[in-house]
Amino acid sequence: MAYHLWSELKASELAAAVTDATVALLPVGAIEQHGPHLPLCTDTTLAEGMALESAKRVRDATVLVLPTLSVAKSDEHLDFPGVLTLDAATLQAVILQIGKSVARSGLRRLVLLNAHGGNVPVLQVVARALRIEAGMFCVSAGWMSMGYPQGLVPESEIRDGIHGGFVETAAMLHFREDLVAMDLARDFVPQSRHVAENNQVLRLMGPVSAGWMVQDLNVDGAAGNAALATREAGQAMVEHAARRYALLIEEVSRHPLSFDAVEA
């Protein structure tokens, strides 16, 4: 069908685009350091880029792409310069109000496209709050959760390369190569790998997790092998994730809004 940028529509055009199946898509990024080789806008660039690439690939739904939420919860990066952050309660309140505003325009389906791990628990709480308080079907999913082309990303990077590593660096080479300093990229070995190798149960992240600051993972504020990244790998990852995310949006568009409909 079609996608539109919410902010570029006239009010009458937006009203005409809204049906029971229309999906609003909110990209959520961050402004925070990503090691010596990537810009502060990395997560915001990836969130916005992935939202547009995904929306373009949607075939069986109408998608309204909301303005990107650039400042989110980045307090694990506070010891580095340039970080802009909200606390969890503020971010939760902001997204809740955005969601309710979307609902007032007649939409009941919202997807939160996330590009920063620190936002995850807040977005999950908001998704349920919007179900309770606004009767919305809200889904939160990071673009990296869509997976990668078979064999492209090393298992060590999938597990530990969570910040400024191979995946994010390659994706940034695809979207904004001009902002990437590959001469400063290297293998930022994360402490989480050492912890996993030397403990049976304790982990820094995952189902068993600790409250860490980013320098607890690596003193340079990155985690993963950025030196492996290429623009070609980034393009392949982005295209794979965008296809999967477009499918998610289509499925959200078709999903019943009530349990009564599911049971029927």
Q: Which residue stretches match the model-derived regions?
A:
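Conserved SAM-binding loop
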Residues: L112
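Extended, histidine- and acidic-residue-enriched regions that form the cofactor-binding/catalytic faces
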Residues: M1-R109, G117-A264
